[in-house]
């Protein structure tokens, strides 16, 4: 039986090796380089690099698991929302009915505001919400008007004092009316904006 080296040599066409040449080839072995201290100092740094890679993999796996958990919780929360299973057409129909209901309610509120009872209430409310200074002036005015008939001579100075206060009260009333009108206009504008949406 022939060895592979013998077959190779016969195929190539070289002469067959003799026993002396075979012995010389087997005795020759490459010498290995001995490890120095410098080579051994690389091991801790290599070990550190490998451990960091493992730690990064563990951290990455934890982060992926946490992201998957939050994603599933979010999907569950979204599925629990009311009306999430409605189609787009159903949602548009609901929106339309809600807008119509809102429009009817706004119209009814406007009708109620125009009733005489509520107009009187709004006037009373606006006079009660006046600042304390205006209320004190009005109280002084009523006190002066009650004391005028009992006094005879100082009546000449008092009417001059009461006249400006009367003009002040009329100005206050007109400003209150204007402010209430602007408030109603603003509320109408906001309701119209809501209806447009």
UniProtKB/Swiss-Prot annotation:
<comment type="subunit">
    <text>Component of the Mediator complex.</text>
</comment>
<keyword id="KW-0175">Coiled coil</keyword>
<feature type="compositionally biased region" description="Basic and acidic residues">
    <location>
        <begin position="183"/>
        <end position="197"/>
    </location>
</feature>
<protein>
    <recommendedName>
        <fullName>Putative mediator of RNA polymerase II transcription subunit 9</fullName>
    </recommendedName>
</protein>
<comment type="function">
    <text>Component of the Mediator complex, a coactivator involved in the regulated transcription of nearly all RNA polymerase II-dependent genes. Mediator functions as a bridge to convey information from gene-specific regulatory proteins to the basal RNA polymerase II transcription machinery. Mediator is recruited to promoters by direct interactions with regulatory proteins and serves as a scaffold for the assembly of a functional preinitiation complex with RNA polymerase II and the general transcription factors.</text>
</comment>
<keyword id="KW-0010">Activator</keyword>
<dbReference type="GO" id="GO:0005198">
    <property type="term" value="F:structural molecule activity"/>
</dbReference>
<feature type="compositionally biased region" description="Polar residues">
    <location>
        <begin position="126"/>
        <end position="144"/>
    </location>
</feature>
<feature type="coiled-coil region">
    <location>
        <begin position="83"/>
        <end position="117"/>
    </location>
</feature>
<keyword id="KW-0805">Transcription regulation</keyword>
<keyword id="KW-0539">Nucleus</keyword>
<keyword id="KW-0804">Transcription</keyword>
<feature type="compositionally biased region" description="Low complexity">
    <location>
        <begin position="145"/>
        <end position="182"/>
    </location>
</feature>
<comment type="similarity">
    <text>Belongs to the Mediator complex subunit 9 family.</text>
</comment>
<dbReference type="GO" id="GO:0006366">
    <property type="term" value="P:transcription by RNA polymerase II"/>
</dbReference>
<feature type="region of interest" description="Disordered">
    <location>
        <begin position="126"/>
        <end position="197"/>
    </location>
</feature>
<dbReference type="GO" id="GO:0070847">
    <property type="term" value="C:core mediator complex"/>
</dbReference>
């Amino acid at each position: 039986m022939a060895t592979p080296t013998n077959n190779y040599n016969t195929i190539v066409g070289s002469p067959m090796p003799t026993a002396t040449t075979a012995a010389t080839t087997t005795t020759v072995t490459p010498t290995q380089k001995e490890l120095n201290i410098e080579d051994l100092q690389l091991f801790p740094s290599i070990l550190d690099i490998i451990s960091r890679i493992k730690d990064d993999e563990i951290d990455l796996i934890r982060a992926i698991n946490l992201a998957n958990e939050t994603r599933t919780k979010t999907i569950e929360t979204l599925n629990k929302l009311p009306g999430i299973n409605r189609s787009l057409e159903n949602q548009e129909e609901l929106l339309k009915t809600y807008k119509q209901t809102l429009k009817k309610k706004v119209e009814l509120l406007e009708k109620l505001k125009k009733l005489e009872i509520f107009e009187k209430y709004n006037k009373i409310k606006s006079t009660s919400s006046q600042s304390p200074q205006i209320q004190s002036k009005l109280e002084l005015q009523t006190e002066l008007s009650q004391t005028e008939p009992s006094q005879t001579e100082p009546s000449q100075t008092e009417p001059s004092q009461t006249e400006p206060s009367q003009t002040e009260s009329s100005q206050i009333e007109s400003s209150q009316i204007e402010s209430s009108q602007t408030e109603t206009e603003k509320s109408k504008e906001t309701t119209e904006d809501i209806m447009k949406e």
